[in-house]
């Protein structure tokens, strides 16, 4: 290998490293700004909780209900911002605790496809099948309160304060709650 070729490769590697570092620094600055932008709302919600703890704890939340939830700004792949969630904790917990267990919804459906053609694999009803066993699809044509076809991401199940929950959008039927339970059991290894 000649010297010029060696130096060209080293130069390219160095340029790629500078580019990665530049993207990393930009991502850090952006995340810092997003967290600082979220802080005033987070403080407002925390103060509201302190002032209204008893009424928040007694808020009537039902298993299978879909609400908007303000997740704020978080780290890594954790859910961020305001998004719909399904309340999955049992109604005893829901009526006595200041927190509830929720499954976040996303409009980004990851669909199972045939390996050779890339075409979606569909149910007998013509609906796409989730790529991941931990996801369960909820369709707008069944739940018109949803703005989009949505995936319930059971691997992202988390406990949130009721103060984070906003508008009640609607509720899932028992069949879909049961199917969500199956995915939850798989996600938690139960």
What is the predicted role of each segment?
Residues 1-190:
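Conserved functional hotspots at enzyme active or ligand-binding sites that engage polyanionic ligands
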């Amino acid at each position: 290998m000649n010297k010029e070729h060696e130096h060209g490769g080293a130069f390219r590697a160095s340029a790629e490293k500078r580019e990665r570092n530049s993207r990393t620094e930009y991502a850090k600055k952006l995340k810092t700004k997003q967290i600082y932008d979220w802080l005033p709302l987070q403080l407002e919600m925390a103060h509201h909780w302190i002032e209204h703890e008893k009424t928040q704890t007694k808020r009537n939340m039902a298993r299978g209900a879909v609400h908007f939830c303000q997740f704020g700004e978080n780290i890594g792949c954790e859910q961020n911002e305001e998004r719909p969630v399904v309340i999955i904790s049992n109604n005893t917990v829901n009526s006595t605790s200041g927190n509830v267990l929720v499954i976040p919804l996303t409009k980004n459906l990851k669909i199972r496809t045939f390996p050779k053609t890339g075409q979606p694999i569909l149910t007998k009803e013509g609906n796409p099948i989730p790529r991941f066993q931990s996801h369960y699809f909820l369709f707008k044509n069944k739940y018109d309160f949803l703005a989009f076809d949505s995936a319930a991401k059971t691997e992202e199940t988390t406990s949130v304060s009721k103060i984070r929950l906003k508008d009640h959008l609607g509720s899932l039927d028992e069949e879909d709650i049961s199917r969500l339970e199956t995915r939850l059991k798989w996600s938690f290894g139960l």
